[in-house]
């Protein structure tokens, strides 16, 4: 069994009067790849920033095991500064001096054909993202946090980014936690899928099990209230119900047509649907 590397206990964050995270309890294991989905404002990016120690809690704590220090946690976000006035090489030199990196890995920089004398502020969003990743990989992180950024970069650089992340997971057993709302391009990454709503995780499943545990019913009328419906989309003439957890016993008792969804369709539903039932951690 994989070693527990992060434990979040009774974690709450308020911003003004709004409770953004509400008594979150969850843990992550070494080498695990996790994707967090949820609607805008659900708390997923705040949660990632808490793991990165960018935001402090009003209640609760996060414990890191296996001797992990801040230097071994990499955080990628489009809101982070990247030494705007520096050239690419100056940024590398500064980062290397701060983290005592003796042998910087130029693989990604060279693959991108970046001019090392080019100002960082003149790089495209995709180039900046890959450059930031190259800086973090040079730290040999044990935890990599990626905050909803890859959907904004072009397909070629997105593929480069994902290849680098997959290599990192395989070579170093790095724990990767990504926040994302588009899953079509990253279905090969997550082992575990979390869905957050109103500051709490309402779904936590292995990606390989999701297809068997979540089904969809399409109907012209409402389904039985005994069916465990986690979200629904309803119009006057058409209704869609997302059933979780699904079981063969449920199918026998309520013989509707239960449709299987792929991971991308599931996440689209969670991001855009109207929740009718919330699940505690």
Residue spans of the language-model regions?
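ABC transporter nucleotide-binding domain
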Residues: 162-176, 181-243
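The feature captures the beta-strand-to-loop junction immediately N-terminal to the Walker
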Residues: 37-39
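Catalytic Walker B motif of ABC-type/P-loop ATPase nucleotide-binding domains
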Residues: 144-148
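ABC-family P-loop ATPase nucleotide-binding domains
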Residues: 79-131
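Conserved ABC transporter NBD signature motif
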Residues: 60-71
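C-terminal coupling/interaction segments
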Residues: 231-281
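Helix-to-loop junction immediately C-terminal to a conserved catalytic motif
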Residues: 52
């Amino acid at each position: 069994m994989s070693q527990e590397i992060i434990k979040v206990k009774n974690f709450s964050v308020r911003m003004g009067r709004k409770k953004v995270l509400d008594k979150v309890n969850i843990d992550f294991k070494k080498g695990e790849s996790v994707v967090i989905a949820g609607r805008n404002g659900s708390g997923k990016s705040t949660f990632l920033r808490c793991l990165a120690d960018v935001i402090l809690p009003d209640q609760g704590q996060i414990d890191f095991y296996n001797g992990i220090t801040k230097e071994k946690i990499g955080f990628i976000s489009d809101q982070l500064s990247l030494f705007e006035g520096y050239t690419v090489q100056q940024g590398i030199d500064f980062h290397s001096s701060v983290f005592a990196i003796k042998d910087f890995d130029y693989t990604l920089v060279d693959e991108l054909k970046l001019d090392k004398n080019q100002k960082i502020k003149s790089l495209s969003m995709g180039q900046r993202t890959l450059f930031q990743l190259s800086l973090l990989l040079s730290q040999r992180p044990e935890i990599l946090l990626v905050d909803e950024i890859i959907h904004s970069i072009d397909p070629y650089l997105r593929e480069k980014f994902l290849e680098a992340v997959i290599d990192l997971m395989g070579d170093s057993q790095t724990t990767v936690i990504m926040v994302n709302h588009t899953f079509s391009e990253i279905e090969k990454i997550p082992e575990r899928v979390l869905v957050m709503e109103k500051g709490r995780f309402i779904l936590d499943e292995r990606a390989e099990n999701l297809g068997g545990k979540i089904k969809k019913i399409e109907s012209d009328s409402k389904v039985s209230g005994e069916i465990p419906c986690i979200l629904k989309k309803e119009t006057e003439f058409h209704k869609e119900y997302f059933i979780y957890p699904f079981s063969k016993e449920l199918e026998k008792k309520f013989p509707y047509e239960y449709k299987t969804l792929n991971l991308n369709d599931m996440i689209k539903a969670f991001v855009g649907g109207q929740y009718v039932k919330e699940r505690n951690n």
